[in-house]
């Protein structure tokens, strides 16, 4: 038999014993009481006392009785009141006494056996019965409701049929009974309200509330039936044995588990027997401790998760701020191991750094707030290891972001395929036989080939001493060809052989071999590290050649630097078609496919002048200030430095509140400054004029009449002064004498002739109104008609209400470029000029 069946049998036995005890007590009370009214009243009061005791026991146990049990207690009080009234009217008949005696004799034997079995029951069986009753309640409730309803209906019909003949005799007592029933109903309602309030507060309050409604309807129907049949029902309930159902057994088993003393057990069983005269379905008992424990556990888990997340965030922030000084390579290697969770074989130094970092993070996680000691938090969260940190929410978020960034980097960068490195020397490239190097191959396998290769290299050293001259000639040939310093995406046999020859010669000629060949198992899958390793091999080979042949040191240094630069350039420029590295199954030495030697530009071979390391010869033009100077001349360099700083400070234009804008264009605007403008505007004009004089090569001379000058500035969209025009009032000008030009075929020769030839002007003065003292445009902004637009604005705004003609404008001592501009603007070479020092004198 299973444990559940045993628990059912035990619970049924216990309920039978408790029922027998209750019947014995009722029979004894009925026998001892006299036939008088007082005796009958005392006999009727006993179940009421038991009900009061049961209520106190419920308060002592702290049990939450269901609404069905409350309704049963209400029905019990009602039936007790009915019994009290009926007993006062009529005495007990002889037939009832006989039947009670028979029931007492039959049940006395079962009570003794039940008490013994009840005391023999262990706590383990009681707990099992409680568990089984709880698990089977939900299954049996639906079927039990229907059976109880059928039993109630059949009982009511029998009671009504039997009591119809005697209803006329009890009409006098019905009035008193009705009053008491109303009082009982009010008491029952109050009890029900209190019970529902307690039940609704519980997590299963809604379910109980629905069941409470069903019990209330059943109790109301029972009360109505009891009003109709008062006397006969009480007798039959006293005579008829109490029906034993599975629900009653469950309720009794639950109360027996809670009760620990025999007296409390008896009171609880008497309450159950009196309250279950009509079979009703009790609700499953919900322990208070289970709900409280669940809430406490949920709160603790939430607190723990929140504190864990906060500590992780704080630890990460602190680690980010403290570990800034560490090298980026170490940090990247540590971070790559955590998100990918791939076991890469690294060096001992990297492992120590990773272990040290994890230890520091564990120490920091114990202190969230630096000003407080969080020992209780440490005790709660002391079991958190690195594995839990990896599985936490914060680390997952960080790892997902880091993986996306790392994937983006890997897509942008190159992971070139690797090819086998073989040292087969091709005679077609070097055009020299080399039997020793042809027979050797740098192939590394998993079975200890490293030591064999070193032995071969040592043997080669002794043989290569005899052919040093040949090695020197080969070295010179390879150094003359700078193609060894450049890289490409594809490998061809002849460049590979030349590269292998270089590496082999460096290995053979070096007295102490500094670089070591690593097997493919130690090479990580990062393409950047592979290319870096290849660059180190090349650089080491070059350095070893420097030691053996010191005569070619500068060229070798240059080639090593170009090797590294070309490797980095190719790593950036190779398209991301090759996504992963492919290693051979038998662990051989491999190099990136992008390492290719090609023919480079033959600039070094055509060097005609020995520069001695100085590449900047001749005239150099500054890209910012536009000044043309000689870089090798210290005086020119100092002049350029002064002009450059002056130009930068003068060209800046922040903007003014009040600007006199004459015209606006897509590429800028033209403003005019007058002598009566604010001081900051005049100061800016003076600064610009000084810079223009230095650029044009004029001497610093004051204007004729400062109070009558007008300055036009062209401001670009990027807030820089790119054009300046200073105009003043004059009275006379002198016309330039145009000479006949020789036969010139091209425009370039014409411009060259105009700049080189001397020109003169007439001595006859002609009237002029406007004299352009200075007109300047930034050299980088020329050929954009900035000067022409400034002159147009000057002609329309120099005199209010009039537009000057080109014949009324004179230029002051123009430069060759200024003369060309005036000729193009005026349309003739015979334009007016004047001396800006003294406009009245002739030039």
From Swiss-Prot:
A molecular-function term among this protein's GO annotations: N-acetyltransferase activity
Polar residues composition-biased segments: 66-78, 269-278
Protein origin, superkingdom: Eukaryota
GO cellular component, one term: nucleus
Phosphoserine, modified sites: 202, 415
InterPro entries: AcTrfase_ESCO_Znf_dom, ESCO_Acetyltransf_dom
Protein's UniProt keywords contain Acyltransferase: yes
Record keywords: Acyltransferase, Cell cycle, Chromosome, Isopeptide bond, Metal-binding, Nucleus, Phosphoprotein, Transferase, Ubl conjugation, Zinc, Zinc-finger
Job of this protein: Acetyltransferase required for the establishment of sister chromatid cohesion. Couples the processes of cohesion and DNA replication to ensure that only sister chromatids become paired together. In contrast to the structural cohesins, the deposition and establishment factors are required only during S phase. Acts by mediating the acetylation of cohesin component SMC3.
Family: Belongs to the acetyltransferase family. ECO subfamily.
Entry remark concerning the domains of this protein: The N-terminal region seems to be responsible for association with chromosomes, thus excluding any involvement of the Zn finger in this process.
PANTHER family from the UniProt entry: N-ACETYLTRANSFERASE ECO (PTHR45884), N-ACETYLTRANSFERASE ESCO1 (PTHR45884:SF1)
Protein known as: N-acetyltransferase ESCO1
Species in which this protein is naturally found: Mus musculus (Mouse)
Gene that this sequence comes from: Esco1
